[in-house]
Amino acid sequence: MQKRHPIIYLLITLLIFVPVSYGALDLELTKGVTAAIPIAIMPFAGPSVLAPGDETIPQVIKNDLQNSGQFRVTGSGNLDQTAASLEQIDYSYWRKQKVNALVVGAINPLGMRRYRVAFTLINVFDSNNRLLSESFNVNAKELRNLAHHISDLIYQKLTGVRGVFSTKIAYVLVQASSENTAAKYTLEVADADGFNPQPLLVSDMPIMSPTWSPDGNKIAYVSFEGHRAAIYLQDLATGRRQRLSEAPGINGAPAFSPDGKQLALVLTKTGNPKIYILNLADGHLREITKGWSIDTEPAWSPDGKSLLFTSNRDGTPQIYNYSFADGSINRVTYRGDYNARPSFMPDGKSIIMMHRENGLFGIARQDLSTGQVQILSESGTDESPSLAPNGKMAIYAMEYGGRGVLAQVSIDGQIKLRLPARNGNVQEPAWSPYLGV
């Protein structure tokens, strides 16, 4: 039999748009969102131009805001109040609909598939209070990205928190093998709503643990090409790769420090898996956990002064905190017989984690001062949570319909939704930091 070699394709740029058709997000409201801001998104004046994905700009904005859990967006039945100008808006109608804010806009063709898009955010209870008004010139391929940007602006104006609709997600897609072919592993990067997935790396050997650099320009991950584990760093703009670690045994669970100068990783240089810190400038490596236990899944605190990790040092997988100041290690989790995959909330006051209780795996949040645990999801198969950069949503993998899919949950547990994905099993999603300015 001819020996099969790993197939590795480096896809240099993520900027080339590949049109792929997906259905709408599958939104599952788990309980009433009583504090949601009521808002209406009106059809934009001008030609009904479809953004990539066959949705209009108002439709993309509506989905973004609604799926955030922070807004109650009026249904399409109320969107017949289109106004040719701001002066024609029937404010009394929208007040009767108990809408607080209104988004109106217009699209004007500029020729050569370019458009001028303008929008205004209005306080319905004060016709003179235009909360936000912006205009942009973009080409047709940029319309969906612009819609996400408008959603970000609206979200921040009304909540005081920066939106994440223009961020990205990375994940591993595993497509099952047939009789004559090996399973295919693809590292993909997509928009935060799951649209526009772009392959970064394709291999017939496993890919694991993608993690974003703090500037959002690179992704580190584990690849088993050559039948051995190694950690790689890949530039998203150029596709250029750098091998960071290929020590004998395990090379796993990379995690960038907040300043991007160091990488926490897991190696088996001394036997059992231990946490190491790699200086990315000079390659200096130091071990920070020791002993017989299995220590893995490091996650930095926002200030870089401590590190969460998963360990079985007390018998079952639990989460511990390592202090860089004195090297002390303290147990963090006690509820449940399995707690893993931790990460800090942006304020450093609580964490999210994979949690098992009564035999069911779910996503949970724990307050670090009180130890109180809130269950966010508990389908029984939820795993690998990753926080949005504003700390308001988490993305994770779950089993649905017999395969692994992407899902999101709001940090209060009120909103759950499934994202579109290609055929296959989705594993280990990672939410990007804020991108650009």
From Swiss-Prot:
Name of a matching Pfam family: PD40
Main localization category: periplasm
GO cellular component: periplasmic space
Subcellular location: Periplasm
Annotated SUPFAM superfamilies: TolB, N-terminal domain, Tricorn protease N-terminal domain
GO BP terms: cell division; protein import
Signal sequence, renumbered to the chain: 1-23
Keyword line: Cell cycle, Cell division, Periplasm, Signal
Keyword Transmembrane helix (UniProt): no
Domain of life: Bacteria
NCBIfam families (UniProt xref): propeller_TolB (TIGR02800)
Main function: Part of the Tol-Pal system, which plays a role in outer membrane invagination during cell division and is important for maintaining outer membrane integrity.
Oligomer and partners: The Tol-Pal system is composed of five core proteins: the inner membrane proteins TolA, TolQ and TolR, the periplasmic protein TolB and the outer membrane protein Pal. They form a network linking the inner and outer membranes and the peptidoglycan layer.
Family: Belongs to the TolB family.
PANTHER family: PROTEIN TOLB (PTHR36842:SF1), PROTEIN TOLB HOMOLOG (PTHR36842)
Protein name: Tol-Pal system protein TolB
Organism whose genome encodes this protein: Coxiella burnetii (strain RSA 493 / Nine Mile phase I)
Gene that this sequence comes from: tolB
